[in-house]
Amino acid sequence: MNPRLAACQALAAVLAGRASLSGALPPQLDKVAPRDRGLTQELAFGAARWQPRLQALAARLLQKPFKAADTDIHALLLIGLYQLLYTRIPPHAAIGETVGCADKLKKGWAKGVLNAVLRRAQREGETLLAEVDRDPSARLGHPRWLLKALKQAWPEQLDALCAANNAHPPMTLRVNRRHGERDAYLAELAEAGIKARACDYSRDGIQLAAPRDVRELPGFAEGRVSVQDEAAQLAAEQLESAPGQRVLDACCAPGGKTCHLLETQPELAEVVAVDLEESRLVRVRENLQRLGLQASLVAADARATGEWWDGKPFQRILLDAPCSATGVIRRHPDIKLARKPEDIAALAHLQGELLDALWPTLEVGGVLLYATCSVMPAENSDSIAAFLARTPGARELDLPGPWGMKQPHGRQLLPQVEGHDGFYYAKLIKISAR
């Protein structure tokens, strides 16, 4: 299949609200020749990443918008514009190949429209973009509501935050310290000709200079290393679990933090890992098996403790709460398209329900680490403030360290262009059963 057509099919599913990019793209990649998969992914992710800007430009170029039934043609136009603006593909090839996809979609009528619009974009692109970019939403590549929320939360960091959201994310590894230390693995990478550096904050983290197929990584299949962003790697260290403890990892999929907990503390009594659906636990099982680790996996709503908790208290709980994922937009750019303003309050409510439900399962003297990959205060510091206000037996513990920014409650990491994702942590101790 033509890579532009495959990217178009995936993006159209996202634009229509039928799927996420991570769900829609893999089936399309299977239809593309291996040599074209990188281009397919670049076009789909790139068009989603810059959709607010590309959409604003398309609105200038089109006499009238496409009908809802022609979302695929709309997606094709965005992919064509992305090629002209953001890639080194020769314009004649970008336009010709993109226009030709209309026949494959059995919409030959669209060829003339696509050809005219893309050729005008090629001729007048700079002038039109100067007009389009007067709108900060287009210039910074974020929907208006999201840009407003980010500006309200992070006025001084707004431009850098948007730049990080629009950047290609780095590939970061987590060395399994059961098999050796980071420095030794860095030496192996150097010997294999793979450029990399030690992460700044995670003692197990390595950031690659350029993404690699995991099959090229020494010892990946044997469980010596995993792929995990540096910000997510901080969870295991901050939880400070000890030998003999029983640990709960709530909302555990895809299992990176579950595995890291077991790698850093091999003598835990048990790790119970809960996620909502059995299908989400498939990846967790695969990761545990590859790494040679064991955990008790439970498919259940973590809030419904009566259905899955055996009554034995946990000494440590990691609550990696469902969130807006606004700290990982660069990895999932379709978040810009899928998220709605009302989602933030709904997610904050869900997070509060999870905190309230899981707190009784924690032993007095035990610690709960609350984590999200969001940069929205309503889901982070505000959620913790509300929980502390209604929970007399909860006290906040300090999170010392050089990473992130101290907030009224917890610490916030914002995504960095050449570094970690956006993440939030807060640490609570149970001082009484109230």
UniProtKB/Swiss-Prot annotation:
Gene Ontology BP terms: regulation of DNA-templated transcription; rRNA base methylation
Membrane spanning residue stretches: none
EC numbers: 2.1.1.176
SUPFAM superfamilies: NusB-like, S-adenosyl-L-methionine-dependent methyltransferases
UniProt binding sites for S-adenosyl-L-methionine: C251, C252, A253, P254, G255, G256, K257, D275, D301, D320
Major place of residence: cytoplasm
GO terms for cellular component: cytosol
Family: Belongs to the class I-like SAM-binding methyltransferase superfamily. RsmB/NOP family.
Protein name as annotated: Ribosomal RNA small subunit methyltransferase B
Origin species: Pseudomonas aeruginosa (strain ATCC 15692 / DSM 22644 / CIP 104116 / JCM 14847 / LMG 12228 / 1C / PRS 101 / PAO1)
